[in-house]
Amino acid sequence: MAYPGQFGNYGNPETYRQNVAGNIASYGGPEIDTQLAAQMNAQMYIQQGSAMAPQPRRARRHKDAHAYDMSLTDAEPALAPVMSPAIPPSMNYPTPSTPSVLPESFSNDTNLLDPAALPSAPEVRYEDQQLFKNQIFNTMEKGSPPMSTTDFVGYEQGNSSSKFVQFTSYAIPATNDVCNASGIPLGMIVQPFAELRPDEAPVPVVDNTNSNPPRCKKCRGYINPFIQFTMASSKWTCNLCGSENSFNDDGFNPLVGSQHDGVESRPELNVGTIDFKVGKDYWIKEDPPKPARFVFMIDVSYEASSKGLPKVAAEAIRNILYGPVPLDPNVKIAIVCFDRSVNFFNLSPNLEQPHMLAASDLENPFVPFSSGLFVDPIASKVVIERLLDSFPAIFQDVKIPEPVVGNALEVVKLLLKETGGKAFVFVSALPTMGLGKLRHREDQRLYGTSDEKNLWNTQDKWYTSLADEYVTAGIGVDIFFTATAYVDVATVGSVATLSGGQIYHYSNFVADRDGSRLKQDLFRSVTREQGYRVMLKTRCSNGLRVSKYLGNFLQRTPQDIEFGSLDADKSVTVLFSYDGKLNGALDAHFQTAVLYTTPSGERRVRVVNYCCAVTSKSYDTISLAIVEPIVAVLAKIASTNIAAGSLKDTSVRLVEGVVKILSSYRKVAANRLTPGQLVLPKNLVLLPILILAVLKSSAIRSGSIHSDIRVSQLREVRAAPIQELMLNLYPNIYALHQLQPTDCLPDPENTGCLPINMPLCVRASRKFIEDGGAFLIVTGQKSYLWFHQRTSPLLLQDLLGVESLEDIDSLKALELPTLDTVLSVQVRNLLSSLRMQFPSMALHPQIVRQGLDGSEGEIFSTLVEDNTREGFGYLDFLTKIHESLHTQGYK
């Protein structure tokens, strides 16, 4: 395979484009209904009324903007739909080659009172998706990368794909003064194990187990596409620090023989993202890397059993071990459960039935046996399935209310300390017995006071000390909280946070309703790409230095951060500061290296490379600023610093961040602006609404928010990838009653990256949520299917096969029936396409019926453009920003 890059022939993007187009059908998968589109196209040519005409699937003709008009029912007539403004013309983003050209501005001066005239996040996202629908994003091309919510195909040409790394601006200020003048925070967000589309080229793997990867002798940066050859190509100059290195030092010279053959055959000199397989010099204490071991640790106390958790967990584990996606054949698993004791299962393939042995010592947990504890799930399939079959019955009569969570976490350490690996722990109640026992400290009287932040910090250092031991041993843990009462996520969850794992919090868990979501979350947690025994370090050009890392990890030194495990759905934010001046004649270079062990037991280094232009003008930095990374960096800084301040202080700093950026823009563009206007740079047109969404998030907003919910969201914000964070802040809302005949169906002429025609979303405001409508709401963590109380019975029948909202059980998981209607096919196709685009997200929608379900409050919290008791509406927030700009004197 030829890798396009900096040297010689860059490869043929057209060939790659054709290969991608040829793979679209396979990417769509069997869940996308392609039959309907062909059937509808064929019927267009059949004379109406012909006896030969086939019977089409039932479809409703659109009336006005509605596919299901309320005039067909006896209910009150629906209000006239609020029409969104037309999609604006394509953005003309400035490019690094012409950084002095200012972006076009958005002025809202003419009609401030019209909500439809405000910048629309759905329209900007839709336009960006259409821009990249039929073209490949080449990483060395000029222009801005696709938005995180855009489904696109990336083609690496030296720089890593924006799926792996994004910068707040692609014009790096040469000095600290220029950076401050721009108002743009200088940072990047790296997602080293980001998942690629099946039709994208996988990350190349270079085998250096016998000879180490070539590295700079001075800064220890890894060889990459941006090095320069010197001295008749026998030496190379490091693009990070400028030092000269010899190829012979590493037994590596790509230019032996012809230059074309040598460089083109080396992926590390052509693509931005690379994996190096490394040898014993990269081992930990000369300990050979071992295949991962997975531990499923299940709470079976009374609270868990009464909620049906053992049954849900057993079904989820069965699907993981014997479902459609096989585990790495080298991985071994153990199943352990706990109530007041820790119960171990011997799953040896030589047994006919699993053997259980309980260890009830609360002060000194131990592992009572080793043989048969970790097993090959295929070799032990019979005995494992017998355990899973009987698992719910074994503990159905358990009446023990206190789970020894601390003992269970200590046992995880004992099980994995020699090999490293990953644990998946289910917790249903506050641990009040055994190691790490905690007290109930939730106190609503603290809400809104200076002492509320105490609820967000750990109450017992035992858990943070355990997390330190986890990281040392290469252990990561994901914790699934299914409690219906206070469980102290801040303390218990710190083990997951510091080890690089994840917190899953299911507030008011109901097995029938939330079980499908939990199963999908656990499946993703186990099967996504991940590594363990992880260390990460970012290097950058002379003149810059790393000032801070943000995320969920353990940091023992200023230079490196460590994880017990790191997976595809985690990001790390890197903030930079100046220790000198960048050379404006050269690019700024950045490299993140991640040392890790794969689940199969290979020691590797994943390297992510990127270069940006350097500028001495602040308006270049503003012109090439990208709104999503800016918002993400500001949100992650806020979620990290909030424990040292207050909710009010955090909100003030976020608003000040927006004002600083916009006031900087007014300074550099003063000669092009009309005094008194509120003007937004077009590339930052979504900055106010996204920051408003941060202010209204359950992580940051004031009000009576349970500390478990707030803490889980704060820690989610710190480590969430940009894509997930953006959808958490501003969801995609699909009006199902307005789907057009071609929406959510395959386009026979579509040669791009989308398997179906995606509809335009509606804005997150009650003004755009129509009476009688049905809406699919997709956030970064959860999805909802919301029905207005006057939803058409015809829609309910075509989508769910029911006659009324009362026929729907909202406490059970939604399973869309396969109906012979156009709407059924459209919605099932839509969900299938979204699951492929957002594999980390739980897309088993929770049904919410207006006026009938208590969870309706969750729906309203997603409508971030509206006024609430705790925050401004969109228009009022823009007014506040405008006033702040005038207060500072920028008129």
Curated annotation (Swiss-Prot):
> Can you list the GO cellular component terms from the UniProt entry?
COPII vesicle coat; cytosol; endoplasmic reticulum exit site
Gene Ontology MF annotations: SNARE binding; zinc ion binding
- Region feature Zinc finger-like, mapped onto this chain: 215-241
Q: Which InterPro entries match?
A: ADF-H/Gelsolin-like_dom_sf (IPR029006), Gelsolin-like_dom (IPR007123), Gelsolin-like_dom_sf (IPR036180), Sec23/24_helical_dom (IPR006900), Sec23/24_helical_dom_sf (IPR036175), Sec23/24_trunk_dom (IPR006896), Sec23_24_beta_S (IPR012990), SEC23_SEC24_subfamily (IPR050550)
Which keywords annotate this record? Protein transport, Transport
Asked whether the keyword Transport is assigned, the reply is yes
What highest taxon heads this organism's lineage? Eukaryota
UniProt keyword annotation of Transcription regulation present = no
Q: Which GO terms describe its biological process?
A: COPII-coated vesicle cargo loading; intracellular protein transport; late endosome to vacuole transport via multivesicular body sorting pathway
Annotated signal peptide: none
Please give the PANTHER family that the UniProt record associates with this protein: SEC24-RELATED PROTEIN, SECRETORY 24CD, ISOFORM C
Q: Which family does it belong to?
A: Belongs to the SEC23/SEC24 family. SEC24 subfamily.
- The protein in question is named Uncharacterized protein C4.03c
What organism is this sequence from? Schizosaccharomyces pombe (strain 972 / ATCC 24843) (Fission yeast)
